Amino acid sequence: MPQLNPAPWFAILVFSWLVFLTVIPPKVLGHTFTNEPTSQSTEKTKPEPWNWPWH
């Protein structure tokens, strides 16, 4: 039963993962994101009071 011999299957598994790990990450990391994070001010803004006409 050749299916039980792990030597060729293990080599194919390791080689395929090696190819995936060398080809896919540069393609994924090469994308640019449209929404770049911006630094926000740490100062808290004072809320403006609402001028409601109370009748």
UniProtKB/Swiss-Prot annotation:
Q: Name one GO cellular component term.
A: mitochondrial membrane
Please state which protein family the record places this protein in: Belongs to the ATPase protein 8 family.
Region annotation (Disordered) maps to: 34-55
| Protein name, as recorded | ATP synthase F(0) complex subunit 8
Assembly and partners?
A: Component of the ATP synthase complex composed at least of ATP5F1A/subunit alpha, ATP5F1B/subunit beta, ATP5MC1/subunit c (homooctomer), MT-ATP6/subunit a, MT-ATP8/subunit 8, ATP5ME/subunit e, ATP5MF/subunit f, ATP5MG/subunit g, ATP5MK/subunit k, ATP5MJ/subunit j, ATP5F1C/subunit gamma, ATP5F1D/subunit delta, ATP5F1E/subunit epsilon, ATP5PF/subunit F6, ATP5PB/subunit b, ATP5PD/subunit d, ATP5PO/subunit OSCP.
Q: What are the subcellular locations of this protein?
A: Mitochondrion membrane
Q: Which GO terms describe its molecular function?
A: proton transmembrane transporter activity
Entry keyword set: ATP synthesis, CF(0), Hydrogen ion transport, Ion transport, Membrane, Mitochondrion, Transmembrane, Transmembrane helix, Transport
Lineage per the UniProt record: Eukaryota, Metazoa, Chordata, Craniata, Vertebrata
Q: What Pfam families would the database entry show?
A: ATP-synt_8
Name its GO BP terms in alphabetical order.
proton motive force-driven ATP synthesis
Give membrane topology per the record.
Single-pass membrane protein
Q: So what does this one do?
A: Subunit 8, of the mitochondrial membrane ATP synthase complex (F(1)F(0) ATP synthase or Complex V) that produces ATP from ADP in the presence of a proton gradient across the membrane which is generated by electron transport complexes of the respiratory chain. ATP synthase complex consist of a soluble F(1) head domain - the catalytic core - and a membrane F(1) domain - the membrane proton channel. These two domains are linked by a central stalk rotating inside the F(1) region and a stationary peripheral stalk.
**Transmembrane segment boundaries:** 4-24
Recorded source organism is Salvelinus fontinalis (Brook trout)
